[in-house]
Amino acid sequence: PTGPADADILVTLTPGHQPTEQYVHDLRLKLGPRFAGVDFSFLPADIVSQILNFGLPSPIDIQVTGYSLQDNRRFANQLLRRIQMVPGTADLRIQQPFDQPHLRINVDRTKAQLAGFTQRDIATNLLISLSGSFQTSPTYWLNPKNGVSYSIATQTPQYRLDSLQGLENIPITGASGATPAILGSLASIQRDTGMALVSHYDIQPVIDIYGSVQRRDLGGVADDIKKIIDDSRKELPHGSEMVVRGQVLT
């Protein structure tokens, strides 16, 4: 998995099974209609395919690199739609989704300062409630009977943070002895979206378009994709680059 919304499903076939490609083809036809809004992709399962892909999850990898992420994202979406028209392509997707649900917390620094809190105080209290105190102040207890050290962490139970109201009720304390307050009195919470995965290549942000082939040779698909890429280069945002990697190059 590459993000919190991803999962791997491993399937082991019993002796005497049919060709694996047939199972993959049937699953591609059935999974999409039954699970709307979910993207499925089949990664190379055997070591030979993994080596031929140079460690990539798909034989086709089109990278769009550059610092203008929003422009690159729009370009990548347009390019993806064009490549989806190529016969024989499968599992086409953008590896870095931009629609991961986020909650944006905007702290009113004036209110926080008047109440005796700093931005660090609020961030630390949030981190303790959401991820546990082990992230900010690790604590250990040594069992004198067996000599083993155990980590001790405090964290707000999940059922107390299952709503925006629960998040707003997170207690905030400061190191300067300020009167404790709740998050809702010092900050506002807004629903937002953002990147679920941030990738870089040679320091620059990168967007990967991954794809596989189905019931067509990789060379034929690669030729069609190359024509689309050559035609799309004139639409590439200023300062960005587009590179093809993976088994498709061999």
Model-based region annotation:
Residues P1-D6, S41-P59, Q63, R93-Q100, ...:
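Flexible hinge/switch segments at interdomain interfaces of large molecular machines
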Residues P1-F54, T110-T136, K145-N146:
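Solvent-exposed, membrane-proximal periplasmic/extracellular interface segments of envelope transport
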Residues D8-L10, D61-Q63, R104, D208-Y210:
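Short aromatic/hydrophobic contact patches that present stacked aromatics
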Residues V11, F42, V64, T154-T156, ...:
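Hydrophobic side chains in beta-strands
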Residues H17-Q18, T65-N72:
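Short, surface-exposed ligand-recognition loops at beta-strand->loop->(often short) alpha-helix junctions
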Residues R73-T250:
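Extracytoplasmic/periplasmic membrane-proximal domains and adjacent transmembrane bundles
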